[in-house]
Amino acid sequence: MKVIFNADDFGLTQGVNQGIVKAHLDGVVKSTTLMVGMPAEQHAVQLAKQLPDLKIGLHLRFTAGRPLTGERNLTDEHGVFTAYRDFWQRRDYQPEAIYHEAIAQVEHFLKLGLTLSHLDSHHHAHTHPQLAPIIYEVAKKYHVPLRDIGMAGEEAFGCRYHFTDFFYDQRLGIDPLMKHLLELKERFDLVEVMCHPAFVDPLLEKCSGYAKQREEELHILTSAQLIQLLVAHDIEITDYSALISAPLHSCV
């Protein structure tokens, strides 16, 4: 079985960026997704350009920060994206607004001089029933894979693929992670593990309720024990680059 450890939130804060880089250089992370238009975007880009083996995707934003397009249909009265707690209840999004914002974020990413490996989204926003079909079309337009959510048992990317958000908060630990991966190994060829390694900084503590746990994730993802166990169980660490030319399947 192959596993993609994808680090979300690249570009959120400098501490997040530095944690992701350490998880790449000293650990199992070979893939990350950048949040364009966020405070540490340029810092992330500078780091990324020094790391040719770190594959960079786009972490689409529809629940954090401000839209690049200024589309009012996507925001609250202050011009900020609809808060996460309200986002999932909304059913009045305009398809054109969603499409234009997604395209703007992809184009912004490309203008940074980075190679786009795949798409996913902050808070899994691309699985919202109004966003899902539109973001799928955006992924097709740019010929990149789109993170698959909740398709256990079905084929994606031409193989038995599964996305897991198991490695999070109360479930953090080498033993639970390995147990989970070995269970998945029975059924899947490719597993993507969502992760959030970081060094906690003041901005992260201010903007995220998930902060201290990120340092625990970083410790685990750079653990020699984890790397040895993956090798011992014939689990290969990979990234999205092998999937660029693979068939693109719907994420929902």
Swiss-Prot record:
InterPro entries: COD_ChbG_bac (IPR022948), Glyco_hydro/deAcase_b/a-brl (IPR011330), YdjC-like (IPR006879). Belongs to the YdjC deacetylase family. The keyword Magnesium applies. Homodimer. HAMAP family: COD. Its cofactor is Mg(2+). It comes from Vibrio cholerae serotype O1 (strain ATCC 39315 / El Tor Inaba N16961). This is Carbohydrate deacetylase. It comes from the Bacteria. One of its GO terms (biological process) is polysaccharide catabolic process. It is an enzyme of class 3 (hydrolase).
